Amino acid sequence: MFQFHLTSKAKKVIELYAQEEAKRLNHDMVTPEHILLGLLYESEALATRVLMRLKIDLDRLKLELESAMVKSSTTKVFGTLPTAPRVQKLISRSAEEARALSHNYIGTEHLLLGLLREESGTAYNVLTSMGLELTILRQEILKMLGVAGSNISSMEQTSQEDNVKKVKTPTLDQFARDLTKMARDKALDRVIGRENEVMRVVQILSRRKKNNPILLGEPGVGKTAIVEGLAEKIVAADVPDILLKKRVLTLDLSSVVAGTKYRGEFEERIKNIVLEIKKASNIIIFIDELHTLIGAGGAEGALDAANMLKPALSRGEIQCIGATTINEYKKYIEKDGALVRRFQPINVEEPSIEDTIEILNGIKGKYEEHHKVKYTDEAINAAAVLSKRYIFERHLPDKAIDLIDEAGSRARLLNMTRPQEFKDLEKKIEELNQQKKRVVESQNFEDAAKIRDEITSLQEELSKKEEKCREEREKIETFIEEDDIRHVISEITNIPIKRLLNSESKRLIGMEEELHQKVVGQKEAISSISKAIRRSRAGLKTSKRPLGSFIFLGPTGVGKTALAKVLSEFMFGDSDALIRIDMSEFMEKFAVSRLIGAPPGYVGYEEGGGLTEKVRRKPYSLILFDEIEKAHPDVTNILLQVLEEGQLTDNFGRKVDFSNTIIIITSNLGARDIVKGSSLGFNAVGSEKDANDIKNFALEELKQNFNPEFLNRIDDIIVFHTLSKEDLKDIINIMLKELNEAIKERNIVINLSEEAKNYIIDKGFDKKYGARSLRRAIQKEIEDYVSTEILFGNIEDGDTINVDRNDGSLIFSYDKSVKTENKELSKS
């Protein structure tokens, strides 16, 4: 139609879209205004992309342009409309712009420049009213085209594009996904941040040689998202001209290998992929988990995928983006120097909490749409902060995204609970179906018809109620709050929910009182531990160190291990959170390696360390090193970095975090002297000076047996004293409570008088063995007798047993459940 050489998109705008717009508005000829409307229809045109980059609202531009153009009331015109003289002038101006840019074609960008050079008319007025200036537009077009004077338009190809057919890529279509197409179709999640990494990828891809980037980072930090971000930038034309027409395809290597039964099939597939990339010349291939190239498809006498791709990569015939973890890169790729030099590494670090919050805010819309919920700002912040604090061995933003995803899923499932009314109706319909089946078998068709009608009525009723319920649910807006995120973390990590709630501070304030209910005596020990724990939970501890580290000194049976068990249940809500390591198992030097795992080549290497594996699985726990003086001295050397840095490297090279553990070390050093310093097995009243002397002696004993660098890293050294008589009575009450709990099923209750308790103490307590001797005394004096009487039938279910003292023995009386019958039996 025109003597000028137009690109395919420019032809389509003038000859198709502009014609359609003129006919739609009942105009009798095509004007520059119709051409501008046509440009807006061609979403992939460079002109449209320039307007979008300049923040021009295309919908508003279209509305203002249409409102400025008067729609004719005449009859619609059919056939091809003539063009106004202004269109000829527009194309002449566009040709001048093309010549100024040393282009041998007229593209949509030149048409847009020509419209702004008109300096009159509706199209010009609307464009300028939107803030568009000729100079700014020309500069932006030059930026997108790259260097001025280029003879190749990256967005709208020259006559070569018009004449050459699109290269077919059947193998790639089968084994790869087009990320640029997915970005164009809005099928990818938004990529927030990572501007530096994306620009580094663009820089490497724009190199002349060795233009293959490889993304290195821990799992979940967003390596694949960077490639998706590149695809989005290509679609938005926010890349240099050399990349504007590129397609980013992600290759599924497992699919390439799958189904290759015979020798040569895999090699043929790889060869076809390379040939198709060469022919297309606009494809960037992305291979996730690049280390799988090493050895992929390799057999005896055959090449693997990596060796087949090396020549093409070195000559720059194909461009490849790789992604893998740092460990896999070292293990597989670094060993192949020829492959390493063909890729340029880009380190992808874990984003900060602030960046993660920004990422979550950017992508939450997709999850809100999927789960039909709304995420509050508090929930988004909690997902980033709490996932960083409580979920280990995974990385942001992946673990935070998983949290909001699962919280949305959980809320949706809670709201979708099927009402009991529906279940009852379905059950009734099922029963009627069974009844109808029996009636039909008996050939009573009249009753069967009645049952059928009843079933139909019930099904209609159920359908209406379900529809009503669905409509009501859609009206309800479900909000994901901070507590929902905490519940999900509790389910993932097995940390009790109360541990995650803010009410924990109230529990910590009353910590001593709660511990005293289960641990008798040892006020100094409980007070010291409570203060240390409060310091750490208030944020006053060094971030990397454990929550607290203590050495418990004292004779056996005074409550060292008992306090550790109670403390683990108080802090972590679970008695199983106690990791108890008996140091008598580590008396030999070679046994020390069992804590962190056997070295390579030794038995048990794959099993990991006895300490490190347990802490990896339960990072919130209390670690009890029982009777450390029995262990080999090298054990204390291993504990040095745990106490100071809060981490330990296991035999696999993994760093295990101890910053959320409490470490308690027990020892019996100086126990004999502590016992000797007590009066008659009980602490003497007013013996504070003696207690201090005993403590100082025990500490001196500790210094003689352990290195200063070990003791210097401990938060507090606590000396447990022997128990007073009142303490022993409290312990008997606790043991009696446990005994009554054991026989609770038979409704039997045992009561002890004060005299009976004194008898147990006099008979059973030995200051050398502590409170454990009381347990043996209760077993011998009470449990043995009661068990015998139960077997003889003298004590029945529901009886109450009262135990008292009579001179040198205990007497037992029974309160029967039906009638009271007293028996007094002497036990010598």
Curated annotation (Swiss-Prot):
One of its GO terms (molecular function) is ATP binding. Keywords: ATP-binding, Chaperone, Cytolysis, Hemolysis, Nucleotide-binding, Repeat, Toxin, Virulence. Residues 4-147 form the Clp R domain. ATP binds at residues 217-224, 554-561. Residues 7-72 are annotated as: Repeat 1. The keyword ATP-binding applies. Gene3D superfamilies: 1.10.8.60, Clp, N-terminal domain, P-loop containing nucleotide triphosphate hydrolases, UVR domain. Pfam families: AAA, AAA_2, AAA_lid_9, Clp_N, ClpB_D2-small. PANTHER family: ATP-DEPENDENT CLP PROTEASE, HEAT SHOCK PROTEIN 104. Belongs to the ClpA/ClpB family. ClpC subfamily. Bacterial hemolysins are exotoxins that attack blood cell membranes and cause cell rupture by mechanisms not clearly defined. This is Hemolysin B. It comes from Brachyspira hyodysenteriae. The lineage of its organism: Bacteria, Pseudomonadati, Spirochaetota, Spirochaetia, Brachyspirales.
